[in-house]
Amino acid sequence: MIAESPTFIEQPITAISPLSIRQPAVTTRLRKENETEVLRFLTERPLHNAVMTGLIRDNGLESKFNRGTFYGCRDGSDALVGVALIGHGVFIDARCDDALQEFARLAQEFPRVHLLMGEQDVVERFWKYYAPHGQSKSRLCREVLLQLSEPPARPDDSANLRLAHLWDLSRVVPVHATMAFEESGVNPLLVDPVGFRQRCRRRIEERRTWVLVEHDKLIFKADVISDSPEVVYLEGICVHPEYRRQRYGSKCLAQLTRSLLGHTRSVSVLVNEERRPAQEFFKQLGFVSRGLYDTIFLRTETALV
C-alpha cells in the first residue's frame, strides 16, 4: 500500500532569495498547455501546495470552479519560480522574492479578494508587498498544519461513516455555513446563498463529503478538499455538540483516514492555533505538526464566500 512508504517531510521556505540572474521576473496567466509543468512544480512541495494541486487535478488550470486565475512567474532562463492562484482566495508558492512581489502586485488588482492563506513566513513577506501602507486586516486566523502518514489503530467498534448523498444536503449546508462564519466572520448563507449551496452540492456529487447520520442528526462531517497521490487535505471536520467526547469523532476520523491512506501517502488538516483540545484530538490519532499557517481575511460583510 502507498501508506506504507516512508514518511515525507517538507522543509519550509525559510528564506526567499532574489533571482540569481538579475533579469526582470515575468508573470503571465497560466494556460492548459502549462498544466504538466505547473503540477511538477507544485508537487515538489506537495504538503504545502495541496489546495492548488487539488484544484488543478479536479478542474484544470482554467475553470470557473477555481474561483480565480492561475499565474506563473518565470526567471531569466524561463524557469518557473512561482505559481499563484488569485481570485476569491490567494494561494502562493514563490521560490524567490521577485515572484512574491509580482503576485502581490497582481493581487492588488483584484478588489474582491476575500482571503490570503499560506505558510506563516510567506504570508508575512507577501503582506509587506501587498499592503505597504499598513492596510488593516479584517481578521487573522493562525492555524497548525498537521499531517498523518500512518493509519490510526483500529478502534474496537467502527462508525457507520458513509459518503454523503444529495438528500443530506439540507443537513450539510447549515453546519458548513456555521463553521465558515466562526472562522471568517462571514455568513455565506447571507452573502452568497445560491453559490454556497452549489459548492456544497458539488462536493457531494464528487464523492468528497463524508457523514455519519443517526436519529436524523448529522453527527460527523468531513470534506475532502484536495486528493492526490501525495496528500489528501481535509476541511470542514465537525462533530455535533451533543455527541462530543463520546468517541464519535475519533472513530469516524480513524475510519476515514485509514480508507484515504490506501491511495495517498498522507492526510493533512489545519487546526486553529488557539484550539488546543482539537489539536490534541488529532495528535492522539497520530497526526504530527508540520508548521504554522496564516489566513488573512480581507473583507467581511461584503465578501463572497
Residue spans for each PLM region:
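Short amphipathic alpha-helix that is part of the acyltransferase structural core
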Residues: 4-52, 151-189, 305
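Acyl-donor-binding surface of acyltransferase catalytic domains
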Residues: 1-17, 75-81, 85-159, 296-297
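Conserved GNAT acetyl-CoA-binding A-motif
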Residues: 111-119, 231, 260-271
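Conserved acetyl-CoA-binding loop-helix of GNAT-fold acetyltransferases
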Residues: 97-106, 239-241, 245-261, 279-280, ...
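Conserved beta-strand-loop-alpha-helix junction that forms the acyl-donor binding cleft
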Residues: 117-123, 269-280, 296-304
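Conserved active-site alpha-helix within GNAT-family acetyltransferase domains
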Residues: 121-139, 250, 273-291
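Conserved donor-binding loop and adjoining core beta-sheet/short helix segment
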Residues: 21-30, 40-49, 53-111, 115, ...
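A mid-sequence, solvent-exposed acidic-amphipathic segment
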Residues: 157-227
